[in-house]
Structure formats: structure tokens, C-alpha cells
């Protein structure tokens, strides 16, 4: 069974604004060594998923610095691997192009290009 993975990097940003004002929730440190994104990434890689996209919203520079090429998860590959998916503002609506997505469905609509290029049979969110 072929599976790709998608991770939302900003799911609970509003829960702790003190920590997420300059970084996304996925890049919040845990245990002084890890970031919160490490856990879903490791779970996906250990389950055999080798193509993973991380949907971002804002303040994702520290996430990009932490992920790097994906070498720590054996995701530095030519095909598959890891992709940072920044918000694509006009992907789903021309009505309000200045507004970023506010729901998960709108975020998924913004990464339809990534989803449509996936040759995998399933996508895990």
C-alpha cells in the first residue's frame, strides 16, 4: 500500500500564543532536544511513509531551519522526501486574496498541486 503524509504545522497556534508568536506550533521545543513536528514525522517514517508535506501558515522559518533537508528522518530523496508547503493565497478564492486560509479545508485546497502530483494511493493527514 502506497501512502503519502500531510502535517499541519499550525493546528493549535492560538492555544499558547506566548510560544507561537514568532514560530509555528510544530517548531515549539519539547524536552530541550526535540520539536513537536518530530513526533508525527518519526511516526510516519517508521510506518513506511516516504513522501511527506508540511502545510505551513506563518512564522515557519524556525520550522524550515529545523527540518532542513529531512536527512535526520531519511527523507533527503529525489523522489518523495519532505516538502514544506507554504500558504498559497489565491489557491482557492480570488474574492479575498489578502487573507490566508483559516480552516483546514482551505489549507488543503491551497496544496492541491502537491496532492494531485501524489502517485500514492492514500494520503494520511
Functional labels for PLM-detected ranges:
Residues 1-82, 90-91, 105, 117:
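N-terminal glycine-rich phosphate-binding loop and ensuing alpha1 helix
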Residues 86:
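Short loop/edge segments at beta-strand edges and connector loops
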Residues 92-108:
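A short, glycine-/small-residue-rich helix N-cap motif at loop->alpha-helix starts
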Residues 106-121:
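Active-site nucleotide-sugar/metal-binding loop of Leloir-type enzymes
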Residues 123-125:
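Short aromatic/hydrophobic "clamp" motif used to bind/position activated sugar donors
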Amino acid at each position: 500500500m502506497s501512502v503519502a503524509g500531510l502535517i499541519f504545522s499550525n493546528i493549535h497556534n492560538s492555544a499558547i500564543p506566548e510560544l507561537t508568536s514568532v514560530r509555528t506550533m510544530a517548531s515549539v521545543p519539547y524536552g530541550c532536544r526535540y520539536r513537536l513536528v518530530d513526533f508525527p514525522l518519526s511516526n510516519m517514517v517508521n510506518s513506511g511513509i516516504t513522501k511527506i508535506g508540511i502545510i505551513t501558515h506563518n512564522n515557519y522559518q524556525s520550522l524550515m531551519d529545523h527540518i532542513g533537508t529531512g536527512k535526520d528522518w531519511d527523507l533527503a530523496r529525489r523522489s518523495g522526501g519532505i516538502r514544506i508547503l507554504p500558504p498559497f493565497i489565491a489557491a482557492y478564492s480570488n474574492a479575498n486574496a489578502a487573507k490566508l486560509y483559516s480552516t483546514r479545508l482551505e489549507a488543503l485546497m491551497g496544496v492541491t498541486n502537491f496532492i494531485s502530483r501524489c502517485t500514492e494511493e492514500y494520503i494520511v493527514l
